[in-house]
Structures are given as structure tokens and as C-alpha cells.
Curated annotation (Swiss-Prot):
Superkingdom classification of source: Archaea
NCBIfam families tied to this protein: AmmeMemoSam_A, PRK00801.1, TIGR00296 family protein
PROSITE patterns associated with the record: AMMECR1
Protein name in the entry: Protein MA_3591
Taxonomic path: Archaea, Methanobacteriati, Methanobacteriota, Stenosarchaea group, Methanomicrobia
Residue stretches making up the AMMECR1 domain: 5-196
Gene3D superfamilies to which the protein is assigned, alphabetical: Hypothetical protein ph0010, domain 1, Hypothetical protein ph0010, domain 2
Signal peptide residue numbers: none
Pfam families documented for this protein: AMMECR1
Species assigned in the record: Methanosarcina acetivorans (strain ATCC 35395 / DSM 2834 / JCM 12185 / C2A)
Length: 199
């Protein structure tokens, strides 16, 4: 778990990365934050960066698994959310002052070992994010997606399957389901105070 101070640093690092990319015209690297980072940023963590503009999703990409340091994962995810999310055109520099930056720090995903009919009871809305895998297909939804969209556990499982390109009931037909938890830090308003969001 990150402290509130570390969470603020995470969001500021994500925003600084996007600003450097869009206004400086170059791909940022480690230490572009211009400050010494707390030790936790040297630990390997999964992370997602989410960008919203006027309440609408503008980009969301991340590292589901702890395959790089938190610092590098935030930098990579911030760049990807801003200019590589295939669902949206790249963010422009003029949008920076209207974007809200959110960083979700993930725990290691763990497979839910339960018969399909018991899976909905194993999913805790507001606590768990989900990954569904079947063959070459994989989909992920962050923990905040279910409460923000008023989903129950069956809806959440179905939407995660669809994110993977599978039928909504694939979870009941042998797809592997993994859960993880997320710690969410976000700006209350563009470039504003950073808070920890809990559901």
C-alpha cells in the first residue's frame, strides 16, 4: 500500500510525464519528475493510468503485472494512456488543463480457483478488479469500473469477458478468472488536489 504522500507523487509523475511528452516534444525517461522519488517507486508494481476529460474516459492503459518498477510503469502507462490508447485520438497539449489524471496501483493478480457457479460469490465489488483469460484472449477491468457503472458481480464478470473479446458468459464456460486489488489516487480537478478514492 502506498501512503497518501506517495500517491500524490504517483499522480504528479504521471502528469509530468504527459506534459513532457506533449509540450516538450520528447519521450520522458526516469527521473524526468525532477525530484527524488520515495523508495516504493523502485519496487516492481502493476499500475494503470486513467485520463478523463469532463467526466468522459480519454485514455486508460497500464501494466497488469509487476514487470517493471513503479516509476517506469507509471511513465510507460501515462505515455500510452495519452497517445497510444487505440480507442481514442492522441491527447493534444491544449487538453492538459482539462484532463484529470488517475493512477491505480495493482496487487499481484491471483487466479480464483472455484467452480464457475461460485465465481460471482468470490468477486467483491469495489474491492476486486478482474482479468479473464481464454486462449489468446485476455481482458481486464479495474476495481473502480464495477461501482462506477453500478454492476453486480455477474455483470462485472460478463463485461470483463467482453473486454477480452469473449462472450459475456465465457467465465461460466471455462475461462480463467483472476482478481486483484487496486489503490486509486486521482486529481479532484485538473491539476488539482490529489485524493485517494475508495469504494
Amino acid at each position: 500500500m502506498l501512503t497518501e504522500t506517495e500517491g500524490r507523487v504517483a499522480v504528479k509523475l504521471a502528469r509530468k510525464t504527459i506534459e513532457t511528452l506533449l509540450l516538450g516534444g520528447r519521450v520522458p525517461g526516469p527521473r524526468d519528475a525532477g525530484t527524488d522519488l520515495p523508495p516504493v517507486f523502485g519496487e516492481n508494481r502493476g499500475v494503470f493510468v486513467t485520463l478523463t476529460e469532463k467526466g468522459m474516459l480519454r485514455g486508460c492503459i497500464g501494466h497488469p503485472y509487476p514487470d517493471s518498477t513503479l516509476e517506469q510503469a507509471i511513465i510507460d502507462s501515462a505515455i500510452s494512456a495519452a497517445v497510444r490508447d487505440p480507442r481514442f485520438p492522441p491527447v493534444g497539449g491544449e487538453e492538459l488543463e482539462s484532463l484529470i489524471v488517475e493512477v491505480t496501483i495493482l496487487t499481484q493478480p491471483e487466479k480464483i480457483n472455484a467452480p464457475p457457479k461460485e465465481l460471482p460469490d468470490k468477486v467483491e465489488i469495489g474491492k476486486h478488479g478482474l482479468i479473464v483469460k481464454q486462449g489468446y484472449c485476455q481482458g481486464l477491468l479495474l476495481p473502480q469500473v464495477a461501482p462506477e457503472n453500478e454492476m453486480d458481480s455477474i455483470d462485472f464478470l460478463g463485461h470483463t469477458c467482453m473486454k477480452a473479446g469473449l462472450s459475456p458468459d465465457a467465465w461460466a464456460k471455462g475461462a480463467e478468472v483472476y482478481c486483484f486489488e487496486g489503490q486509486i489516487f486521482k486529481e479532484k480537478e485538473p491539476e488539482g488536489e490529489v485524493i485517494e478514492e475508495k469504494f
